[in-house]
Amino acid sequence: MAAPDLSTNLQEEATCAICLDYFTDPVMTDCGHNFCRECIRRCWGQPEGPYACPECREVSAQRNLRPNRPLAKMAEMARRLHPPSPVPQGVCAAHREPLTTFCGDDLSLLCPTCERSEHWAHRVRPLQEAADDLKGRLEKSLEHLRKQMEDAMLFQAQAEETCALWQKMVESQRQNVLGEFERLRRLLAEEEQQLLQKLEEEELEVLPRLREGAARLGQQSTQLAALVSELESRCQLPALGLLQDIKDALCRVQDVKLQPPAVVPMELRTVCRVPGLVETLRRFRGDITLDPDTANPELVLSEDRRSVQRGEQRQALPDSPERFDPGPCVLGQERITSGRHYWEVEVGDQTSWALGVCKETVNRKEKGELSAGNGFWILVFLGSFYNSNERAFSPLRDPPKRVGIFLDYEAGHLSFYSATDGSLLFIFPETPFSGTLRPLFSPLSSSPTPMTICRLIGVSGDTLGPQ
């Protein structure tokens, strides 16, 4: 019988005298009795003393509670050996007594022990009375909740309708995008074929004439060479031989009439113009301004640092390492190390200019070739033709009033366009850019109209203007 007695004693020692259940976080009072921390807290209730022990009624002035960890381990052991039996419905889980009343403060069911202990100062009511009162409150809550549920269902339906509408809008826009780009691809393909056809027609029209003229000149050169050789040989003959048939030789000399080739304009009538290209490039536009510290002393900059022109006389400016001298150049403030960039420059009626980009580290104090090998990628306009140190390029019939420059750093792409009609002026061979690049501007000739960097006009911003 010793084992059952030990087991029973273990259960008794591990049971709280307030809740009659195994201890949870047990604490010891000054008088040496143990209780669950939450049980004694609810039992003492009042924030100020004196505090009476629920078991021996000994009073203490302070709320001294010491954790009892060995007892906590004992309670856990008892809980494992003898798990608490399920509490029947209508029975207090703490005291195993019938639930007979209801606490209006804690909204909990009470047994007589609960009512006498921690709930002694609360509003306690009989079960039926409390049930009738709370039933009315629940019915009012149900009415409110049903209204909330109706609203929630309405909102859900609206949200689902909005979701479906949004999906339709997205799909419609997706089809619009696909359709527009397909239309644009067809348009570009048609435009490409038309330009290639025009170029081929122009080639078939002009090239045979050039070849015919070259062949005719070749025949004339052969005939002239034969006549020259004959006359040279005749000049070496003695008098009799030289004078024999001289009349025929002189007549043939007089009959020689060189026919110059027909003049063929070197400008191509067919220009490379892609519809909508400039508008697309303007998505990458940047706000470029001029750097006065780099300007040649012969150049005059506007106050807003967007315009530059050749001055009448050289200015007295500090000779800093950043300044171009003798080259009539000025750089943009912006330093480019990545990305796509586009800017437009109003050149007006200037007879000569240079535009492009250069490396930050270029030599600014010596005259030299402004080539890619020296860190310059520029297009030069000299009144009637364009050129670049990379290769020559045929000019347009009408020089542009405004030039667009597009730079794709990672792709190594630099191209120039007439911003007025979108025609291609020049494109550099693919270049692996490295280091920092700066926009370069150079009015090579004097002009009453300055070279001006175009700025964005308005807030919506699809138009560029010089001012």
UniProtKB/Swiss-Prot annotation:
Keywords: Antiviral defense, Coiled coil, Cytoplasm, Metal-binding, Nucleus, Phosphoprotein, Transferase, Ubl conjugation, Ubl conjugation pathway, Zinc, Zinc-finger
Family matches, as Pfam families: PRY (PF13765), SPRY (PF00622), zf-B_box (PF00643), zf-C3HC4_4 (PF15227)
Keyword Ubl conjugation: yes
Basic and acidic residues bias (residue ranges): 304-313
GO MF annotation terms: protein domain specific binding; protein-macromolecule adaptor activity; ubiquitin protein ligase activity; ubiquitin-protein transferase activity; zinc ion binding
GO biological process, one term: host-mediated suppression of symbiont invasion
InterPro entries per the UniProt record, alphabetical: B30.2/SPRY, B30.2/SPRY_sf, Butyrophylin_SPRY, ConA-like_dom_sf, PRY, SPRY_dom, TRIM/RBCC, Znf_B-box
Modified sites of kind Phosphoserine: 85
Reaction(s) this enzyme catalyzes, per UniProt: S-ubiquitinyl-[E2 ubiquitin-conjugating enzyme]-L-cysteine + [acceptor protein]-L-lysine = [E2 ubiquitin-conjugating enzyme]-L-cysteine + N(6)-ubiquitinyl-[acceptor protein]-L-lysine
Domain B30.2/SPRY: from-to ranges: 267-460
Region ranges (Disordered): 304-325
Binding site for Zn(2+): 92, 95, 114, 119
Pathway: Protein modification; protein ubiquitination
Protein localization: Cytoplasm; Nucleus
ZnF (RING-type) ranges: 16-57
UniProt feature coiled coil, ranges: 127-207
Post-translational modification: Autoubiquitinated upon DNA stimulation; autoubiquitination promotes interaction with SQSTM1/p62 and recruitment of AIM2 to autophagosomes.
PROSITE patterns to which the protein is assigned, alphabetical: B302_SPRY, ZF_BBOX, ZF_RING_1, ZF_RING_2
Domain notes: The coiled-coil domain and the B30.2 domain are both necessary for interaction with HN and PAX6. They are also involved in MED15-binding.
Family: Belongs to the TRIM/RBCC family.
Assembly and oligomerization: Binds cytoplasmic tail of integrin alpha-1. Interacts with the HN peptide. Interacts with PHOX2B. Interacts (when autoubiquitinated) with SQSTM1/p62; promoting AIM2 recruitment to autophagosomes. Interacts with AIM2; promoting its autophagy-dependent degradation.
Role noted for this protein: E3 ubiquitin-protein ligase that promotes the degradation of insoluble ubiquitinated proteins, including insoluble PAX6, poly-Gln repeat expanded HTT and poly-Ala repeat expanded ARX. Mediates PAX6 ubiquitination leading to proteasomal degradation, thereby modulating cortical neurogenesis. May also inhibit PAX6 transcriptional activity, possibly in part by preventing the binding of PAX6 to its consensus sequences. May contribute to the regulation of the intracellular level of HN (humanin) or HN-containing proteins through the proteasomal degradation pathway.
Protein name: E3 ubiquitin-protein ligase TRIM11
This protein's encoding gene: Trim11
